[in-house]
Amino acid sequence: MNAGRVFTEKYLRLMFKSLRDATPEEVMEELEHCRRENRRPVRIPRYFRGFFVEDEKFRASTGFEMQVFRHEVPELVEGPKHNLILYLHGGAFIYPPVFFHGRFLHDIALRTHCDALMPVYPKSPEYDCEYSVKTLLEYYQSLSESKRYDEIHLVGDSAGACLCLVVAQEAHKNGWQKPATTTLLSPCVDLNHTKEKEMQALQDKDSMLQYDRIVILNAIWQGKLAAMHPWVSPVFGDLGCIDNLCVYYGSDEILQPDDLFLKAMYEKAGKSGIFQEYEGMFHTFAMFPIPEGFRATKKIAAFIKERRLH
């Protein structure tokens, strides 16, 4: 086991310890903290100020003004600018984007020579799934109707990967521009918790997530929608409409059974995608600066480039 991976996993265990070990009451306190924090605008970390700029806020019919960050590829990188990576960040539906999201998106954008946008969508507990999805769908519709990009490539991690599947399904349903590729990192796709026993069996191996806490957070995010509603659990939606699907996940995360379930359901819909399970890896490992993360990032970039038409 390499030193970088050991350090990263220990760092993650420490960073998420308060939520992993929290009582239900402490989880609710954390949610209220997130509610206050999410009312504040997200700031670009100093390290990324040469690459990311804040785009114009998108005002949805819901009334929400959504921050959007644009990645500007330096002039020294040659390549077409008419392809877009739309990145939906994770964070248990409650947290804003962090440094590792920016680092990963920066790397992917440089490797693929694509423009990149990262919207800061509405979060729980202030907003629920229905409100947030409506906001994101309006934003995607605006991108589609602008005809600015020849291709849109969806990329997301964890909760954001869930939303990527929702957007891809709704784009097909509504006749909007179809995503050229959809890439998911450790997606959370089944809030019905169909694989509950299998998820709990992996609990001791997971350095970030705690099953009981996820159930609480997911129930609040779910709002009034049914657990098997395709906006809540897109694994039960129209998977047959999604082409060029690529999924990366680790064997040591409690969402691994979810991702195997997604693979089975995708194949049941008559589709064939790329599902890469990395042995001994943790949740969203591909985002982190470790050898396995670098290798996964290179493969993801190659996947996008190989399936580009322009």
Model region roles, listed by residue range:
Residues M1-L76, L309:
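A glycine/proline-hinged amphipathic helix-loop "lid/cap" segment
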Residues T62-Q67, E75-H310:
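Alpha/beta-hydrolase superfamily serine-hydrolase fold, recognizing
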